[in-house]
Amino acid sequence: MTILEIVFLERRPFKLFHLEKVRFQSFARLWTKNGEVMSTEMPGPSFELLSRCKGVVLDIGPGSGEMISRFNPEQIIALYGAEPAEVLHPGLVRNAKTRGFKSNFHPLVCGGEPESLIPALHKSGVLDISGKAGSAEDGVFDEICCTRVLCGVPHPQQTIKGLYSLLKPGGRMVIAEHVANPWRTEGRMAARFMQVVFTLIGWPFLMGGCELQRHTAEYLRDAGEWDKFDLKYYGTEEVIPFVVGELIKKHASLDKSYAAAVKV
């Protein structure tokens, strides 16, 4: 439907050569119609984990903000929402205000990948080291939330390492992501097979870049050192199983030269 809209309603067929824009528009169309319903339930302790977020928080891929209702604004100093689909931002801002976030909510038109996120954070005033913040080890955020978003970032391993760098030592990462079915341990081979089938018939393109076969738990473990790594699988007999949990970044000494340049 997205392709038909671009060609016949917008009358901009050359837009099809910009696959990134098509992907965002496809996702925006899907989320506008189904985002609220898809956010009424989440596997495991997803909502409880989000409700405990505090301090300076980065929410990757909040869409139009349906999940913002799960945050407690009284515990949050500043909430940054990194959403690349700009068409979803009016709903995102509206939902943030409804929930009680005002001047402490900052929408960012960017994705979670470093080449998109770092410039946006620099522009917003959070980062004050041009070109260096993405690899710094001191971090900026007390918490980073990834809810059904790492399935769609272009380079998941690079993106996750970048997010790890932005997390303060001792900071928490909240994860609720669908992943490749763990059929070798606790999943089902039939479900894993169907993930392959859906991918071959065009799931990623039709679903706005969403990938069914990512080993996100492994990517997270390899991103850096963790004091706590608590992820559990949910729905392992299904085609779309999830990993849900929290990770605590290993404590380390701060680089004061970098810390002095970080503003929140």
Regions found by a protein language model. Name each.
Residues 33-56, 64-70:
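Conserved alpha-helix/loop element of class I SAM-dependent methyltransferases that forms part
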Residues 141-156:
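A short SAM/SAH-binding and catalytic strip from SAM-dependent methyltransferases
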Residues 157-169:
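A short glycine-rich, Lys/Arg-flanked "PGG" loop and its adjoining helix->strand segment in the class I
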Residues 1-31, 36-38, 42-46:
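N-terminal, positively charged/glycine-rich alpha-helical extensions of SAM-dependent methyltransferases
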